[in-house]
């Protein structure tokens, strides 16, 4: 397996700029800094409550992003980006697409198409999705994990069919003389990166995935324990457990000084990230999750229904110690040390969210750019 690598992910939110310009700028800067991949999210609307996506909390950025819930469709955008990406050479992927509202045959087709367009540089990130992108639109949400397991098995069945008719019983996605005849690129399909956290998801990762990319694990010890479950499942399925890339999606907040970092961590929008962490993580810090002790986390939030007063009250309850778990934060040297600890617990690939961009002060947002670049360069040396 290669040494430590990193990519980065952007939300595909509509801005005042031409639709693909922010993404293209990110790809160019990422290539300069040594990134391996560029990812885009897959959401119908934002995970940030629109009630606080305002100048009061976002500053000037709210003028650039006037509607936080206006999100572009990811596969369409990636197809557009692929045309100009050959010189940069970054791999392109969705982080992560939804096994609920997207039929797996359509997902298999989209990923295979992008793989051909990019000459073998497409990646399929996939997970259960979130309630906010399913239930409000009439998509059944009572068994998201079972639906995900069947979606993943369906994608593999279609890709492995060699153009032969496929029939397969399934509670959610039965196939009856189904046909999938797109070819792989030079004999290889896109890598499947699974956002898994619970036991059944981790087992499915070991059975079907090329990489594991959790989003809400908050401690390196949790990471290493879950990675062991993935590798055991891979062995049980007759696969090489070490062939599965251990990755993670994590936000990074850095700045020129520790005071700048602490100020950013204390903002309402950044503290809202902790709402996506399950109640058990809050309980370790002696605080009940404001949405309930048993709240599952990001997959069950419907942010468009949360008003400003409620958001602010929730943010005030977030323990400072929890904020330091849900993000890599600090000076560049401190952040690199934190990533190194995760590396020592098995992490080999980090997909970065630049949390330093979420700041009501334009000056401090700009001043964090160079420290963030120092972090990314430092990751290459891990």
Swiss-Prot record:
Catalyzes the reduction of the keto moiety of phthiodiolone dimycocerosates (DIM B) and glycosylated phenolphthiodiolone dimycocerosates to form the intermediate compounds phthiotriol and glycosylated phenolphthiotriol dimycocerosates during phthiocerol dimycocerosates (DIM A) and glycosylated phenolphthiocerol dimycocerosates (PGL) biosynthesis. Keywords: Lipid biosynthesis, Lipid metabolism, Oxidoreductase. Its EC number is 1.2.-.-. GO terms for molecular function: oxidoreductase activity, acting on paired donors, with incorporation or reduction of molecular oxygen. It comes from Mycobacterium leprae (strain TN). Pfam families: Bac_luciferase. One of its GO terms (biological process) is lipid metabolic process. The keyword Lipid metabolism applies. Belongs to the mer family. Phthiodiolone/phenolphthiodiolone dimycocerosates ketoreductase subfamily. This is Phthiodiolone/phenolphthiodiolone dimycocerosates ketoreductase.
């Amino acid at each position: 397996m290669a040494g430590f690598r990193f990519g980065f992910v952007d939300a595909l939110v509509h801005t005042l700029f031409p639709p693909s310009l922010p993404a293209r700028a990110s790809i160019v800067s990422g290539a300069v800094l040594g990134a391996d991949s560029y990812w885009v999210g897959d959401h119908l609307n934002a995970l940030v409550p629109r009630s606080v996506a305002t100048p009061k909390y976002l500053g000037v950025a709210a003028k650039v992003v006037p509607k936080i819930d206006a999100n572009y469709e990811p596969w369409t955008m990636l197809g557009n980006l692929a045309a100009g990406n050959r010189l940069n050479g970054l791999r392109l992927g969705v982080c992560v697409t939804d096994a609920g509202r997207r039929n797996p045959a359509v997902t298999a087709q989209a990923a295979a198409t992008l793989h051909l367009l990019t000459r073998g540089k497409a990646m399929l990130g996939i997970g259960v999705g979130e309630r906010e992108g399913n239930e409000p639109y009439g998509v059944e949400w009572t068994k998201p994990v079972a639906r995900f397991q069947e979606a993943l098995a369906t994608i593999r069945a279609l890709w492995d069919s060699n153009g032969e008719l496929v029939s397969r019983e399934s509670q959610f996605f039965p196939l009856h003389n189904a046909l999938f005849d797109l070819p792989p690129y030079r004999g290889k399909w896109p890598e499947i990166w699974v956002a898994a956290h619970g036991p059944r998801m981790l087992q499915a990762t070991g059975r079907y995935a090329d990489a594991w990319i959790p989003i809400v694990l908050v401690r390196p010890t949790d990471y290493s324990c879950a990675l062991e479950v993935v590798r055991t499942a891979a062995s049980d399925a007759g696969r090489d457990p070490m062939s599965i890339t251990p990755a993670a999606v994590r936000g990074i907040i850095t700045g020129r000084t520790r005071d700048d970092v602490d100020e950013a961590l204390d903002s309402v929008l950044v503290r809202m990230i902790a709402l996506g962490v399950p109640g058990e993580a809050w309980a370790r810090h002696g605080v009940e999750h404001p949405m309930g002790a048993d709240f599952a986390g990001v997959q069950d939030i419907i942010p468009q229904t949360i008003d400003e007063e409620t958001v602010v009250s929730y943010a005030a309850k977030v323990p400072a110690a929890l904020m330091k778990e849900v993000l890599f934060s600090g000076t560049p040297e401190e952040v690199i040390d934190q990533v190194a600890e995760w590396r020592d617990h098995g992490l080999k690939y980090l997909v970065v969210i630049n949390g330093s961009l979420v700041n009501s002060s334009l000056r401090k947002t700009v001043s964090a750019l160079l420290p963030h670049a120092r972090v990314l360069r430092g990751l290459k040396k891990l």
